[in-house]
Swiss-Prot record:
Name of protein: Glycogen synthase
Pathway: Glycan biosynthesis; glycogen biosynthesis
A GO biological-process term: glycogen biosynthetic process
CDD domains to which the protein is assigned, alphabetical: GT5_Glycogen_synthase_DULL1-like
Length: 477
């Protein structure tokens, strides 16, 4: 079966978040099961030159963009048994700064989605499945169904649409309906791609794809309800029989403390006690923390946005500063949350360290050098950081929501089982109590090391998830 993964980013070529990690890892896992796999993404101007040098030009495209025709080109790169296709258009994709948030994002990703479909018309091997990801490719299943179903070559193609984060929906003015998408008014309805009087690319994917997935079973259930549904819970409930939750994995080769060259000292299950101490000291020195082996160090690596629980941290930040532990923050995002981290760092020198921005080496050092890892998310579709931290022997402290609930087993003091610590309600003092519990267990060394052992030996690979995706694809066979 030929499966194309269509996404706006994929590691290692371009990454702004977890989407790129998934599209970088899942195709390899599915290919390992014997499927013929390709990935299609834009050719951004900021892709590293080393990768660009490996790309092979295939052919040009003329892509309908409303009443206009836009030029594009398709390039190809083979890597680790996967064929990567890159859609090139310098006007849309050779821009400085961030990938998203441009004034013409509706047009940029409409162009990309139609370019993928136009590209298929020039290929000898037509894909059986187009697996689209998040709002940036949500319009593709709608294009396929509305503009291409009359063409025989496209009639057997089926679509899978994965929701990585329902909060980001790709919402645009009604005017693009005809001018850009070339859809008639019959599609601008509550049953179609309209939501609150606007065109919604995420909803287009939900309405027009053949199957829908989310990135964890619990998140799948949560988004059926208004609290988590971001206004689209009704559309999701209507398609509920076609929606399934399949848990993300992580790339075990990239995230391996035994081979990770980004950390101060590598370690494994037998040597983690010594290895983590070396990394802890390096992390403390890097962030200006007091260098102490005996104090618990709690890491935090995340986008600093409302989803990630920064308001809980802010609500008890004075109490956190008085705890017998240290904090290491890494991330960037909304100015008000960056300010909270700055203020905590200034108020508690030697106890709170931070870096505003993103540094992949520092991120890995936090995973390796911390004792615990804080993720108090308001919602979390899956989360990858908790999986990485457990693989590195760093126990997560999480709010039990979405993928965090599915992946972190809270500590049971009676059975000594668990891989981390959890709290249920989105409440600052409940989070604080859970951190205090983790600190107590940290000093019960036998119990703590038993938890670390369980965390490091759990399976965080794509193996089981890839099998579930393969079963989903073969529903169409």
């Amino acid at each position: 079966m030929k499966i194309w993964y269509v996404a706006s980013e994929a590691a290692p070529f371009m990454k702004t978040g977890g989407l790129a990690d998934v599209v970088g890892s899942l195709p390899q896992a599915v290919a390992g099961l014997g499927e013929e796999v390709s990935v299609v993404m834009p050719k951004y101007g900021s892709i590293a030159e080393a990768y660009v040098d490996e790309m092979e030009y295939l052919f040009d495209l003329i892509v309908p963009v409303g009443w206009r025709k836009q030029f594009g080109a398709v390039l190809k790169l083979e890597r680790d048994g996967i064929t990567y296709y890159f859609i090139d258009n310098e006007y849309y994709f050779k821009r400085d700064g961030v990938l998203y948030g441009h004034f013409d994002d509706a047009e940029r990703f409409a162009f990309f989605s139609r370019a993928v479909l136009e590209m298929i018309g020039k290929m000898e091997d037509v894909p059986d499945v187009l697996h689209c990801h998040d709002w940036q490719t949500g319009i593709l299943p709608a294009f396929l169904r509305i503009h291409y179903q009359h063409i025989e070559a496209y009639q057997r193609i089926r679509t899978v649409y994965t929701i990585h984060n329902l909060q980001y929906q790709g919402i645009f003015p009604e005017e693009i309906l005809g001018e850009l998408l070339q859809f008639g008014p019959e599609h601008f309805t509550a049953e179609g791609i309209q939501h609150n009087g606007l065109v919604n690319y995420m909803k287009a994917g939900i309405v027009h794809s053949d199957q829908i997935t989310t990135v964890s079973p619990s998140y799948r259930d949560e988004i059926m309800e208004p609290y988590y549904g971001e206004g689209l819970d009704g559309a999701l409930r209507y398609r509920a029989v076609d929606v399934r939750g399949i848990l993300n994995g992580i790339d075990l080769a990239t995230n391996d403390p035994n081979t990770d060259q980004r950390i101060a000292e590598t370690y494994n299950l037998d040597t983690y006690k010594e290895g983590k101490v070396v990394n802890k000291r390096a992390l403390q020195e890097r962030l200006g923390l007091e260098v102490r082996d005996d104090v618990m160090l709690i890491g935090f690596v995340s986008r600093l946005v409302d989803q990630k629980g920064l308001d809980l941290i802010n609500g008890v930040r004075e109490e956190l500063g008085q705890l017998p532990c240290q904090f290491a923050f890494l991330g960037s995002g909304q100015p008000e949350y960056e300010g909270i981290v700055h203020e905590m760092t200034a108020a508690h020198p030697g106890k709170v360290g931070s870096y505003i921005g993103f540094d992949i080496e520092l991120a890995h050092l936090i995973y390796a050098g911390s004792d615990a890892f804080l993720m108090p998310s308001r919602f979390e579709p899956c989360g990858l950081s908790q999986l990485i931290s457990m693989r590195y022997g760093t126990l997560p402290i999480v709010r039990e929501t979405g993928g965090l609930r599915d992946t972190v087993k809270p500590y049971n003091e009676f059975t000594q089982e668990g891989t981390g610590f959890g709290f249920m309600n989105y409440n600052a003092h409940e989070m604080l109590a859970t951190i205090e519990k983790a600190i107590r267990v940290f000093y019960e060394k036998e119990n703590w090391h038993a938890l670390v052992h369980q965390a490091m030996t759990a399976d965080y690979s794509w193996k089981q998830s890839a099998k579930q995706y393969r079963e989903l694809y073969h529903l169409f066979a």
